[in-house]
Amino acid sequence: MGPNRIYISVGYSTFGMLVGFSAFIVWNVVYKQPWTAAMGGLSGVLALWALVTHIMYIQDYWRTWLKGLKFFMFVSSVFSLLAVAAFATFITLSVIEKQSLSDPKSFYLSAVWSFMTLKWAFLLGLYSYRYRQEFADISILSDF
């Protein structure tokens, strides 16, 4: 990744982390909706994980720990499956209970945050895969 592109990714991950943690606090304190809060908080944690991935890339830490990137890809796939299951569950519950789209306590917002969690899980896996490919190529060349 180019130097400007990596810093854009760092900024985007930071913004995602702040928004996710804000959703966690707001839906716990103001709306008393734990499911939306949980999915918002999980989205923030995955954004934080993506941020850590970028920072470790900038500090050139991944060169010596490619197994860590493999672990991050595994975690990404687990949380992707969890997010898809949560999305389907929340949409189903919203339809069955005939909830309003504009109600802040509806399961539709939980489904939205489940989708955001899926997005961050996918991005974590994508970034980990790209960094692993980059450093795997470099480590092959350094063996000669």
UniProtKB/Swiss-Prot annotation:
Subcellular compartments: Endosome membrane; Lysosome membrane; Cytoplasmic vesicle, Phagosome membrane
GO biological process: heme transport
Membrane-spanning ranges: 6-26, 38-58, 71-91, 107-127
Pfam families in alphabetical order: HRG
InterPro entries cross-referenced by the UniProt entry: HRG
Family recorded in the similarity comment: Belongs to the HRG family.
Name recorded for this polypeptide: Heme transporter hrg1-B
Species whose genome carries this gene: Danio rerio (Zebrafish)
